[in-house]
Amino acid sequence: MRYKYLTIALIFSALNAQGEISLENVLDRTFRTESIGRYDWKNSSDAYYFTERSDEGLDFYEYNLASNDTLKAFSVQKSVISDFSYSFSPDQTKLLLKKNSKKLWRHSSYGSYYVYDIASESVTPVTSDPDSLRNVKFSPDSNKLAFVRNDNNLYLFDLIDSREEQLTFDGSEDILNGHFGWVYEEEFGTYDSYKWSPNSQYIAFIREDQTYVKEYALVDYEAQYPVVKYIRYPKTGEDNPIVSISILDLENKEYRSVHLPETAYYIPDIIWQVNSSNLYFATLNRKQNDWNLYKYDFDTNRGDLILNDSNDSWIDRDPFTVPGEIGTWTTKGGFSSAILENGEILWISEKDGFSHIYRNRPDGRPINQVTRGNWEVNNISAIDTKNEIIYFSGKKETETENHIYSIKFNGSRLKRLTKEKGSHSSSFSPTLNYFINSYSSFTVPPKTFLRQDSGKIVRVLAETDRSQFDAYGLTYPQLINIFTDDGT
């Protein structure tokens, strides 16, 4: 029997003439939750980096999970550069710094980019004109950067000889190379339309042609006088952007266009298999209920269909992920699909009526359904290919809670790793020995644990003080079951 749950709550109701919540309480942050803030995993280790601001600049610290020790790793001095956001290079010897960020659409932005070399403490602008760059990404070997300028062309910047190279030449307001337009940001939540090959030799990118998409007028009221702006907006029955895939061979200076099937109405994803030159791409029809995965054949310049997922309503698929390191697949936000080193595919589908993990051979033939039952898998948290273990989040016990589990590739040894009632999320260390577990419930404010891969709690990393709410006599939500006329 399926239940409908309603949350009945007046969380901020004051009882028995106890303290009342005022606007000042909100503005001065009387109520606050605790977390460990931003952190970046250190490669091949059980440690992560976090930052603290000082009078001199931004200090980076390394926290060791096993020993509970913290040491200062390096600093970026204000005298060198300030007011930036950052991301690490794949080898973690450099930082990509972004200044003057300006919002483009919902997820995308552009800005000025610089590279900070940690060892030499030096800053290099990304090209002689580092402004108005978007979708800037390191190559896997950390020696190059690819990016898109506001002319909607792809460019390459070699960090060894500080040389810039233009890779595409047909970019315009209508032709977008390496960066999706508004439609893909809204439909699929992504703006990134190019991928580096693992050996840094190739770039596969999507070319989006918006020529036949009609414009829609929007009024921007932020300025003193309203400004009319136009976006390419395909209404029902009107033309969508036309998309195509091209591959750039940076070493041999070759360019090829991939022959696509007629069903390639949307191309929501392109994927390089880890540690290989195998390329895959996904297509989706306009109704977004028929998804296909193709493996590209360099000899025939065509894609061979290996997976299909379809239903009568809608296919909800996130992009494939790539591993942080060979053998250990982990990302902070979780993922729904992965093509492993041996070519096997682990992916989440709702084809049996519930969201579950499936395992397929490199040619697409099924091996086994990993999880099953009348419950849902939310996403995959990490994959241990050596020991054939999948860590994932799901709702096996109840729809109103989310827990972290582990299971073998063959579907055996399903184990729940989090015991506390509530909602749990996880981020596994590169070694998969530990995971950071953020947790909260209707009665427990946000709390962060460090756990071993077995689920055993090592220590509390952050805990919200509940007493700050108690003085206001706050009530907590309660769940009740509401039955419909047919008993469901």
PLM-predicted stretches and their roles:
Residues Y39-D46, Y86-K94, V136-K144, R149, ...:
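Blade-terminus and WD-like Trp-Asp/Gly-His loop motifs, strongest in beta-propeller folds
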Residues N68-K102, D129-S132, S310-S313, P323, ...:
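Blade-loop segments of beta-propeller domains
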Residues H107-Y155, D161-S193:
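Asp-box/WD-like beta-propeller blade repeats and closely related beta-sheet repeat scaffolds
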Residues G37-D40, T51-F60, A73, K98, ...:
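Non-catalytic accessory segments flanking enzyme active sites
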Residues L65-N68, D117-E121, L159-S162, D249-K253, ...:
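Short loop/turn segments that connect beta-strands within beta-propeller blades
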Residues S54-E56, W105-G111, R149, G237-P241, ...:
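Short, solvent-exposed loop/turn segments at conserved positions within beta-propeller repeat blades
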Residues I206-R365:
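Beta-propeller domains
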